[in-house]
Amino acid sequence: MTSLLALSPLILVCATAIVVMLTIAWRRHHELTATLTVVGLNLALAAQVVAWWQAPVSVTPLMTVDGLAVFGGVLILIATLACATLGHAYLEGAQGPREEYYLLLLCAAAGGLALVSSRHLAALFFGLELLSMPLYGMLAYTYRERGALEAGIKYMVLSAAASAFLLFGMALLYSRTGHLDFAGLGEALATAGGDGWLMAGMGMMLIGLGFKLSIVPFHLWTPDVYEGSPAPAATFLASASKVAVLLVLLRLLQSSPVQDAWLHSLLAVLAFVTMLVGNLLALTQNDLKRLLGYSSIAHFGYLLVALVVNDGLAAETAALYLVTYVLTTLGAFGVVTLLSSPYSGADASQLHHYRGLFWRRPYLTAVLTVMMLSLAGIPFTAGFIGKFYIVAVGVEASRWWLVGGVVAGSAIGLYYYLRVMVTLFLPEPGMQRRDATTDWAQRAGGVVVLGLAALVVVLGVYPAPMIDWVRFMVAG
């Protein structure tokens, strides 16, 4: 009974997916399908409280529900709820089937919940594939648009290659240690010394997970996929998907710490290069979705700093940064979603689509401005708190060159974030683009982005509740 209660959020999401599938087979109705999805996700989010009271509990040898799993589950469900709500506004004017989007979204969310609870390589692979496969369909959902079809196929092919690296790395680890559980791997790695096959296995696993996190040099797919995919699907890929992978990587490194100096140094170099490459490549972008893609690369470079340090504050720092990143990313992509719709061609992602937005959509302009400031790490926004923690753990560990990389990357990023903000307030152009819904503020999507903007500001001014909650969850 305890195990069932601990897994109740995952069970509810899976049950909702089944109900939605049966509903689609019975009767196609966009409003009904979206409502069932949102109700099921809200029930799953409420069930996280029940799961927390049961934690920590081992659910079979494959999964464990502890504070970190509940924390990741909350973030994934919040991001999925936002994507479902924003997707409703986005798909309202779409031609053809719309209901399957919610089914794919629920299946991907179930994969994310399974992934953050995994403590075994088999569960890790199962959760990762359950998360990735629905994304193939979501990214190519508006298949009449050439860019969406290209994004879906590109992500599918490269993701399959990354999964092959991941599987081969798992095979090498199992052949040398006889263990697939994280704890057993940790003990074997601690006593193995500098075994080359073990390090090769860990390295190949890092390649597979690094692809999912867009770590340099496995990042080249990111801007193309973000640009071509439908805005709600890109939102999920940039938020919930990366949260799940980052948290399972954190759990893996905590259970199976990297002892060899060269592999530890490799992680540090990857963090440094990812920070700088992501920010430098974003400087020349004129497409907001591509810009946010490169920005995402840079932010996961910052997050790698916490994983490299891997001291007492590493988990807390990574979790805190994930909260600020998810809120900000959902808000930024939410504005893109509300200004886009399949009935007016490709998404409103070019910067010239946002020229003079202040004069016709002042509230959306305010939201996007807040999100850009938070991504840049400006004080009085949630993004500043996350970046402060990253710098603090780097200083505490005397990783001065990584701290320098964070500071330099943030300085470079400030330029292109300000460039977006300036565009919003330029004189209005003669040609206006058709937006998704005219009375957006009366709809749930507008409420979502306004609520996210308010949270980003409030948590930036008064971060104590967020810090206490993260510390409580990670410690539990």
Curated annotation (Swiss-Prot):
GO cellular component, as recorded: plasma membrane
Catalytically driven reaction(s): a quinone + NADH + 5 H(+)(in) = a quinol + NAD(+) + 4 H(+)(out)
GO BP terms in the entry: ATP synthesis coupled electron transport
Family of the protein in this entry: Belongs to the complex I subunit 2 family.
Subunit structure: NDH-1 is composed of 14 different subunits. Subunits NuoA, H, J, K, L, M, N constitute the membrane sector of the complex.
Cysteine-cysteine disulfides: none
Membrane topology value: Multi-pass membrane protein
Segments traversing the membrane: 4-24, 32-52, 67-87, 100-117, 121-141, 155-175, 198-218, 230-250, 263-283, 291-311, 319-339, 366-386, 406-426, 447-467
Main location: membrane
Protein source organism: Chromohalobacter salexigens (strain ATCC BAA-138 / DSM 3043 / CIP 106854 / NCIMB 13768 / 1H11)
The protein's name: NADH-quinone oxidoreductase subunit N
EC number: 7.1.1.-
GO molecular-function term, one example from the UniProt record: NADH:ubiquinone reductase (non-electrogenic) activity
Subcellular location: Cell inner membrane
Keywords assigned by UniProt, alphabetized: Cell inner membrane, Cell membrane, Membrane, NAD, Quinone, Translocase, Transmembrane, Transmembrane helix, Transport, Ubiquinone
Protein purpose: NDH-1 shuttles electrons from NADH, via FMN and iron-sulfur (Fe-S) centers, to quinones in the respiratory chain. The immediate electron acceptor for the enzyme in this species is believed to be ubiquinone. Couples the redox reaction to proton translocation (for every two electrons transferred, four hydrogen ions are translocated across the cytoplasmic membrane), and thus conserves the redox energy in a proton gradient.
HAMAP family, per database record: NDH1_NuoN_1 (MF_00445)
